[in-house]
C-alpha cells in the first residue's frame, strides 16, 4: 500500500512539472543514490509537456485495502474480475470514492453460438490465476473468488493446480464465474439479463 501511494505521488509531481523532481521516500528515491549508483544523479524535470498536468491515473487493484486506497489516491480503478451481479464484493471499498472516480471494467465480448467454446479460454485463465498465481494461503485471486461466494470451488481449484492437475483445475472453475465477467454468446444472450441465482 505504501509503495503504491508513494508511486502515485511521484507520478503526479512529475506530470505537474512544478519542480525538479526529488523524492526522499522509502521506495522510489529520486535521484537514486543506493547500491550501484554513481552518486552523480540530480533532480530532473520531465521534458515532455503533457496536454494537462492532471493526467488521470488508473490503478489495477484487487485486495480490499488496495481498492480502498485506489479510490482515495487515483482517478480510476481497473478491476481484474468484476461481476455486476455481485456489487457487494467491493461495495464498502468504493462507497467513499472521490467524485468523478471511474471504474473501467475490462469485459471480453464475443458473438458466437458456441458459448462453451467461447468460455473455455476464460475458464483456463481463471483456473490459472485462482490456482497458481500466488502461494497457498496467500493468493489474492483465490481470496477474491471467495469474496464472490466461490470459496470452496476456489480452494479446490488451487489444490488441483498446485498438484499439477491443470486440466482438472480448469474444469473445476464454476460456470457462473466466467459467465458473469464476460459477454459471450449469440446476440440474444448478450442483452441485459437478470442476475444468476446465488451458488
Predicted regions, residues:
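Active-site-adjacent structural elements that line small-molecule/cofactor binding pockets in enzymes
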Residues: 1-199
